[in-house]
Curated annotation (Swiss-Prot):
Broad class of where this protein is predominantly found: cytoplasm
GO CC, any one term: cytosolic large ribosomal subunit
GO biological process, alphabetically ordered: cytoplasmic translation
Presence of keyword Ribosomal protein: yes
Subcellular location: Cytoplasm
Record lineage: Eukaryota, Viridiplantae, Streptophyta, Embryophyta, Tracheophyta
Record-linked InterPro entries: NA-bd_OB-fold, Rib_uL2_dom2, Ribosomal_uL2, Ribosomal_uL2_arc_euk, Ribosomal_uL2_C, Ribosomal_uL2_CS, Ribosomal_uL2_dom3, Ribosomal_uL2_RNA-bd_dom
Annotated keywords: Cytoplasm, Ribonucleoprotein, Ribosomal protein
Family to which this protein belongs: Belongs to the universal ribosomal protein uL2 family.
UniProt-listed Pfam families: Ribosomal_L2 (PF00181), Ribosomal_L2_C (PF03947)
Regions crossing the membrane: none
Molecular-function GO term, any one: structural constituent of ribosome
Gene3D superfamilies for this protein: 2.30.30.30, Nucleic acid-binding proteins (2.40.50.140), Ribosomal protein L2, domain 3 (4.10.950.10)
The organism of origin for this protein: Nicotiana tabacum (Common tobacco)
Protein name, as recorded: Large ribosomal subunit protein uL2
Length: 260
């Protein structure tokens, strides 16, 4: 019998330990309170830091508690143009400036925003990676919802009370710079997850993978497998409708879908 293949080893059944060493902390908005619902709070950016495993930089913002003498420190996903010493305003009556946090109902249509909440008070879900942004399309005051365009191009309707940050996430164009050498990829994935380097199945021995073995690297049989194939056999094109290059009508349909 062959060995357990990679898909079986990474499957359910083992204790997962997240790669969180040296992480600075979760990046999210302040907890929604009375001050943000009815006015605004003023904070100052004390430092802009790098978070290992995250493409976008983080901004450490210090607020004063509205009802007691104390300071509150939060980590925000930094927007393009943020700087140390900048004042950040969070709340319903904050001004429309890059880095400020307002509810969607206070944003004009066509504005560029980032770190958008999905539900009121969840502290930011959408458009958070480096260079990402969402666009406010329209408001519906009748049912209190707002339609936004996400970085993927899909449209989504969220409550108008959801908060978001004005501007685009910093670090845009990060993926356009080539890795150039394996050492850079090693350091990148070392702080992310155990997924590098990834050996191809055809480069393995037959005891290690269904695609392994042979005098030259080839699968040796059809790469399509059934949907109900057992673990260890279920590798390749799972329940594939077709194989090979897209030609003719299929290529035209795929090109039309990419443009949409």
């Amino acid at each position: 019998m062959g060995r357990l293949i990679r898909a079986q080893r990474k499957g359910a059944g083992s204790v997962f330990k997240s790669h969180t060493h040296h992480r600075k902390g979760p990046a999210r908005f302040r907890s929604l309170d009375f001050g943000e619902r009815n006015g605004y709070l003023k904070g100052v950016i004390t430092e802009v830091i790098h978070d290992p495993g995250r493409g976008a930089p983080l901004a450490r913002v210090t607020f004063r508690y509205p009802f007691r003498y104390n300071h509150q420190k939060e980590l925000f996903v930094a927007a393009e143009g943020m700087y140390t010493g900048q004042f950040v305003y969070c709340g319903k009556k904050a001004t429309l400036m890059v880095g400020n946090v307002l509810p969607l109902r206070s944003i004009p249509e066509g504005a560029v925003v980032c770190n958008v909440e999905h539900k009121v008070g969840d502290r930011g879900v959408f458009a958070r990676c480096s260079g990402a942004y969402a666009i406010v399309i329209s408001h519906n005051p009748d049912n209190g919802t707002t339609r936004i365009k996400l970085p993927s191009g899909s449209k989504k309707i969220v409550p108008s009370g959801c908060r978001r940050m004005i501007g685009q996430v910093a670090g845009g164009g990060r993926t356009e710079k080539p890795m150039l050498k394996a050492g850079n990829a090693y350091h990148k994935y070392r702080v992310k997850r155990n997924c590098w380097p990834k050996v191809r199945g055809v480069a393995m021995n037959p005891v290690e993978h269904p695609h392994g073995g042979g005098n030259h690297q080839h699968i040796g049989h059809a790469s399509t497998v059934a949907r109900d194939a057992p673990p260890g056999q279920k590798v390749g094109l799972i329940a594939g409708r077709r194989t090979g290059r897209l030609r003719g009508q299929a290529a035209a349909t795929a090109a039309k879908a990419d443009k949409a």
